[in-house]
From Swiss-Prot:
The Ti plasmid contains at least six transcriptional units, designated vir loci, which are essential for efficient crown-gall tumorigenesis. It comes from the Bacteria. The lineage of its organism: Bacteria, Pseudomonadati, Pseudomonadota, Alphaproteobacteria, Hyphomicrobiales. SUPFAM superfamilies: P-loop containing nucleoside triphosphate hydrolases. This is Protein virC1. It comes from Rhizobium radiobacter. Keywords: Crown gall tumor, Plasmid. Pfam families: VirC1 (PF07015). InterPro entries: DNA_Partitioning_ATPase (IPR050678), P-loop_NTPase (IPR027417), VirC1 (IPR009744). The keyword Flavoprotein does not apply.
Amino acid sequence: MQLLTFCSFKGGAGKTTALMGLCAALANDGKRVALFDADENRPLTRWRENALQSSTWDPRCEVYSADEMPLLEAAYENAELEGFDYALADTRGGSSELNNTIIASSNLLLIPTMLTPLDIDEALSTYRYVIELMLSENLAIPTAVLRQRVPVGRLTTSQRRMSEMLESLPVVPSPMHERDAFSAMKERGMLHLTLLNMGTDPTMRLIERNLRIAMEEVVVISKLISKILEA
């Protein structure tokens, strides 16, 4: 089982949204995915509840509460016993013993960020923290920045400057763009199943097209992440 962790010191950086998108891509590819809800607000648990109500939850995926150390340990053990292909961890903001344990146990670390000065500053702080933690523990875990909510059109001067600041870091080549399909995942449920349901309704063709573009985007990101894991 490969553990992929989404981490950021800043709340609202897009950790949960990025995780949901990647989860949909992996499940759509037939992978079994465990989700570790380590944020005390338990957004993944609420996501699952909403998805079940909308019949957009994939049974190949399961959410485990992991916002305390005993829960995390039990979640990891159970997920391995169940034979999941991947575990995706949604961490809480800031540093903590729990976050450190998740980071140190990971096969890949993803640091989501939007292209604002505050977000980039927090992403850089998170990256430095992760590197220092790995050095102190004598670990070498692949780490990459994932750009979030990138405008579909032209970037502003400020956004271009922020993007250039990331060039010295490992960055997932393809970003997640700012799309309604992504922002609505928490309410609608899993992206690939929402798309499947929309495809049967001829009156929803425009929304279906937007969902399809978003799905294609996370599939590309999923393949890029798989290459990082295989390296």
